[in-house]
Amino acid sequence: MTQDELKKAVGWAALDYVRPDTIVGVGTGSTAAHFIDALGSIKHQIKGAVSSSDASTEKLKSLGIPVFDANEVDSLDVYVDGADEINGHMQMIKGGGAALTREKIISALSRQFICIVDASKQVDVLGKFPLPVEVIPMARSYVARELVKLGGQPVYRQGVVTDNGNVILDVHNLNIMDAIAVENHINGIPGVVTVGLFANRGADVALVGTSEGVKTVVK
């Protein structure tokens, strides 16, 4: 199977976790896009979705799925999204698509987080994929210097403005042994909106696309 076929397989497999008459949290990226396609096939069975990006909102609406603002819901039954990396503790790096802040808000609202990935995203130690940090523009240089102190090499993601109007620093060369501590430390730097480490709130279930089929990993 190609990588895209693996992504499609896990996107459709995630439908098993969607209950009727609920509002579904929906992520961003190529794997999440397959889940949105799958969601379109049961759109009359659900109330709608809360979306983590303008791109996902556009795709949901094009399929006729109602989109709710996060402020309109008290909680979500399930949130389905991909990841750039996931370790054995179900902690993730996310934010390659620059939607990390909204993704983190939706994950906090959700009772269950289903991570959908192909097997290439599974790692023993997080950090080979550059760690995205969303930053208020005026704090970019200050935050970059603070990230250097952590041993990372921050790179400004040129030409990218998040849906919230902020910028992204991608931190290279981090070997993240204690993901919760790193998440808390970076989130405490003034000017940081959020970091793309999902460690305090990791995934509850990972659906992993492999050549043998979809493998289910439970926290």
Curated annotation (Swiss-Prot):
**Active site, per annotation:** E103
Name a single GO cellular component. cytosol
Q: Which reaction does it catalyse?
A: aldehydo-D-ribose 5-phosphate = D-ribulose 5-phosphate
A GO MF term: ribose-5-phosphate isomerase activity
Q: Where does substrate bind?
A: T28, G29, S30, T31, D81, G82, A83, D84, K94, G95, G96, G97, K121
> What does the entry give for GO biological process?
D-ribose metabolic process; pentose-phosphate shunt, non-oxidative branch
InterPro entries in UniProt: NagB/RpiA_transferase-like, Ribose5P_isomerase_typA_subgr, Ribose5P_isomerase_type_A
Keywords of this entry: Isomerase
User: What is its pathway?
Assistant: Carbohydrate degradation; pentose phosphate pathway; D-ribose 5-phosphate from D-ribulose 5-phosphate (non-oxidative stage): step 1/1
Please state the Enzyme Commission number of this protein. 5.3.1.6
Q: Which HAMAP family match?
A: Rib_5P_isom_A
Function, as annotated: Catalyzes the reversible conversion of ribose-5-phosphate to ribulose 5-phosphate.
Q: Which family does it belong to?
A: Belongs to the ribose 5-phosphate isomerase family.
Subunit-structure text: Homodimer.
Report what the protein is called. Ribose-5-phosphate isomerase A
Task: Give the species.
Answer: Pectobacterium carotovorum subsp. carotovorum (strain PC1)
